[in-house]
Amino acid sequence: MSNEKAGGYISKIHFNDGTDVDIQQNDIVIFVGPNNTGKSQSLKDIYALASEKQPTTVVTDITIKKSPTNIKDLLDSIAPKELQGSSALYNVLGHAFYYNKDTDDLFLSEPYFNVFLNLFVANLDTAARLTICNPPDSITRKSPKYHPIHYAAFDSKYRKWLSNNFKKAFGIEISPNILNGSTIPLCMGPTVILNGEYDDEQSRQEDFASKLETYKQIQNQGDGIKSFTGILLYLMLDYFCTFLIDEPESFLHPPQARIMGQIIGHTLSNQQQCFISTHSEEIIKGLLEVTPERIKIIRITRKEDTNYFSILNNDKVKDIWGDPLLKYSNIMSSLFHKSVVLCESDSDCKMYSVIESHLKQSYGKYSETLFIHCGGKHRMAKIASALRALNIDVKLIADIDVLNDNQVFKGIVEAFGIEWPSVQSNYNKIVANLHSPKEKINRNEARTTINRIIDNSH
């Protein structure tokens, strides 16, 4: 039997400006950019197009690479079947899927997932994450599971995974209360361990139920806990091929957002992909900490009604994140700023940011510029190249001794799209003059020249 996951994956995205982006089966694609540029809409478009070709806004089409693995084997493993004539009916998370002898051939012949959309694609928008925490009706152990909580309620693998990952963020376990009655709520509290002696099993279960009744229930907690839990409830279902997660940081404090990024990166297998829209540096850092080689960043900007897309591919992301100094810098914050200035050191950043802020305030404006220290001039070209690839407005301020190293300066020049031969002659003249015997400076002439430069800069 093949180990290839049934279903398929999105192998290419076509954007409305004509840009095409190749996607790997295990890619984690992160959409970033200013507000109202199309990040969330991109996820909505992908979900709609995964079903069938239809009019969309930002993403105009997708290409899906199908797996030849038998769909019936997957359905048999996750849901009981009900025979209806020549077809078998499977109920999975409230969605009905019919299978007959022609299903696999028909599935492979169609370009999209069609009726199997919700078997292979999990769409985790904010509303879905909050409402999925509501307790589902109780079912028998062998009944079709139409809610993720049913999986945690009747399979210890899911229950333990859910509780362990919830505890990473909030320091406490959660458990499904299958003895609650008509519904199965998720309860927050230490794992119940009964050490007493009981006359019979019924008495032990009654004591277990009474302890869970004292615990707080997830659906009654704040939106942060509910949103976090909602993502976990879908992530634990490993038969999905593609996850769409809109702003997973919603309602979360930065530490929990970072943990969520780590959990997503740890959980997704190499046969699963994920598309995320986010405003959170912490989500991105969490993902990068565990799986930098899988990350692809797509920055979306918009001018009037036209979208523009810039891509930072996996190898470039991994290269930057592999540098220890850059890993612990604020470089990822640049994805959410209007402009960026690169400096050599943190003290340079502080000095220039004070100057820039003062100038902006004198005109009644606020600074939208991020100053990033590169840990020295040798890293400047690498960072500038990466940020420019994402269409970020980048400026660079280096110390004058950058001119002492021909290769470093050449790398910086080329990182800004300037051909080295066009500046090499002037560079050589300046360097030759810098290294020539020093002449005495006339202070009055220097003062006059400096004042003239300042006056002309207004």
Feature map (PLM): residue ranges:
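Hydrophobic, Leu/Ile/Phe/Ala-enriched alpha-helical segments that form helix-helix packing faces
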Residues: 46, 50, 162-174, 264, ...
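Acidic, divalent-metal-binding catalytic cores of TOPRIM
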Residues: 285, 300-458
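Switch/communication elements of ASCE P-loop NTPase nucleotide-binding domains
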Residues: 1-52, 197-333, 350
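N-terminal-biased segments
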Residues: 109-118, 161-194, 330-349, 360
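Conserved P-loop NTP-binding catalytic core
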Residues: 2, 45-135, 139-140
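Conserved, well-structured beta-alpha core segment at the onset of a catalytic domain
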Residues: 2-69, 132-151, 357-398, 402-403, ...
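Extended helical coiled-coil dimerization/tether regions that scaffold
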Residues: 2-6, 12, 122-228, 233-242, ...
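Charged, glycine/proline-rich intrinsically disordered loops and linkers
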Residues: 69-90, 195-216, 220, 423-457
